[in-house]
A protein has these predicted regions:
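Glycine-rich phosphate-binding loops that contact phosphosugars or nucleotide phosphates
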Residues: 22-142, 146-156
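A short, charged, Gly/Pro-tolerant segment at domain boundaries
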Residues: 157-173
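Helix-enriched interaction subdomains in cytosolic or periplasmic regions
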Residues: 1-3
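A short, well-structured juxtamembrane/interface segment
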Residues: 6-23
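Residue-level recognition of alpha-helical structural elements
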Residues: 10-13, 95, 159-160
Length: 173
């Protein structure tokens, strides 16, 4: 499945996304169900790359986030089908407000994909018994890990080292 995702990915999409992410200080994630797990992992990685990130599990909060998001925020959607009605409502609102939209999906011809500025297509399988959602999550995590690695190339190593030192001095577990 990961080989399939790797073959589907277009390097120019990563460059387009990197350009959008480099211009912003804040990434708002929009996802539902198991995709929220990927959004949370990506958000914690992006924070390490100096990108403030927001993830809300409740759809009400995602709607509110979209209504108040400054246009400088980049919206990052994770949707296997690209046809979730609630995510579509949010994406349409963000598009009207002028926000850039990134999308990870298994459906590059979906309605949500048509609203996105950058689309990452990942593998899935059609039948639930073939673990379709799990295959999708694996590919989605792969994409967010690559984006994190790209963002980290833009971070000053000394800054990262200072953060690490501060954390080790002030947080003892």
């Amino acid at each position: 499945a990961l080989k399939d995702t790797r073959a589907m990915l277009d390097p120019s999409e990563f460059m387009r996304a990197l350009h959008l992410l480099s211009k912003t200080e804040h990434v708002d994630f929009y996802a539902m169900d198991n995709n929220l797990d990927i959004a949370n992992m990506a958000a914690s990685s992006f924070i390490m790359a100096n990108k403030c990130s927001t993830v809300h599990a409740a759809m009400t909060m995602q709607y509110l986030q979209a209504t108040g998001a400054p246009k400088e925020h980049v919206a990052f959607f994770i949707s296997r089908t690209g046809e979730n009605r609630m995510l579509l409502d949010i994406a349409r609102l963000l598009k009207l407000r002028g926000n850039s939209i990134l999308l990870i999906t298994a459906s590059p011809e979906s309605t949500l994909a048509s609203l996105a500025d950058s689309v990452f297509r990942v593998a899935t399988v059609k039948r639930m018994e073939e673990l379709g959602p799990r295959v999708f999550l694996l590919g989605a995590k792969y994409v967010t890990d690559i984006l994190f690695a790209l963002l980290m190339t833009r971070v000053d190593y000394r800054n990262t080292q200072q953060k690490e030192e501060w954390l080790s001095q002030h947080f003892h577990y």
